[in-house]
């Protein structure tokens, strides 16, 4: 039997509040929506749940508020097989929320998202200090940018010092220090985040411009990133590392109804 990898996810919980509408309101305007949904999410929780569904042993470290959203999100992750025993509760701050306006048309849907981090942003280095010794017991550490950057940089350095691979999804896009980039065994931005961090856009207007990809890849390698994975939406993904640059096409879909799914 294959060993189940032990994955540590240090990241966010966000309750998605999704309002679907034919047209997003202008400033000062009210429109009648099509429907409203709530969905437990957060980039960290989503990573944890998907890894658990793929068979990994997953421990989630994060923070929620002392409210219904916090309880729903931790229960949802636990029901997927994620160990949430290290998820803390901030009794003075609300759980994180993502407010999503989903503009639906006959051609698909576009989203506009406002994130209120809440308790995610009150998680401190002191709260996760126990990881400094425990982190060596994991096969991989996964993080995103919905926590305070000090927490992300500190945990990434602990993992690197312990020889544990680190995967970072730099979203939402934010400046990355050379120290943090050098800790990333795997960096997985989308094309917009990659352009911001590398200082060079990737043209996908007529297909993927591989010269742009090569420039971006070299920029990251020069700052210490070992392996780069760039997601390109309908244009697939790029994997770049010591073996070169590889472009993988995505599965073509006739219609995408919900980009938040």
Which sequence ranges carry the predicted segments?
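Short, small-residue alpha-helix embedded
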Residues: 48-50, 54-56, 195-196, 256-261
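Conserved N-terminal subdomain of the carbohydrate kinase-like
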Residues: 4, 15, 27-31, 38, ...
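Positively charged, low-complexity intrinsically disordered leader regions
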Residues: 1-27
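Conserved phosphate/ATP/ADP-binding segment of small-molecule kinases
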Residues: 153-247, 252-255
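A short, N-terminal amphipathic alpha-helix
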Residues: 41-58, 217-223
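Short glycine/threonine-rich catalytic loop with a Thr-x-Gly-x-Asp
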Residues: 37-40, 44-47, 232, 250-261
């Amino acid at each position: 039997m294959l060993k189940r990898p032990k994955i540590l996810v240090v990241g966010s919980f966000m309750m998605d509040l999704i309002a679907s509408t034919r047209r997003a309101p202008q400033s000062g305007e009210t429109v009648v929506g099509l429907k409203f949904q709530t969905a437990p999410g957060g980039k960290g929780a989503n990573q944890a749940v998907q890894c658990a569904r793929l068979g990994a042993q997953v421990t989630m470290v994060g923070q929620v508020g002392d409210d219904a959203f916090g309880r729903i999100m931790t229960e949802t992750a636990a029901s997927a097989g994620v160990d949430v025993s290290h998820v803390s509760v901030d009794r003075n701050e609300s759980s994180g929320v993502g407010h999503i306006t989903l503009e639906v048309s006959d051609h698909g849907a576009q989203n506009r998202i406002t994130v209120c981090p809440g308790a995610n942003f009150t998680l401190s280095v002191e709260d996760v200090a126990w990881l400094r010794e425990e982190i060596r017991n994991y096969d991989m550490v996964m993080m995103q940018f919905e926590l305070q950057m000090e927490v992300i940089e500190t945990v990434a350095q602990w993992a690197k010092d312990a020889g544990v691979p680190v995967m970072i999804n730099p979203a939402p896009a934010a400046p990355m220090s050379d120290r943090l980039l050098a800790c990333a065994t795997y960096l997985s931005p989308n094309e917009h985040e990659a352009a911001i961090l590398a200082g060079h856009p990737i043209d996908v207007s007529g297909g993927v411009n591989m010269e742009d990809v090569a420039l971006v890849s070299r920029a990251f390698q020069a700052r210490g990133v070992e392996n780069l994975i760039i997601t390109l939406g309908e244009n697939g993904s790029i994997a770049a590392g010591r073996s070169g640059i590889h472009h993988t096409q995505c599965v073509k879909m006739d219609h995408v109804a919900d980009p938040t799914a």
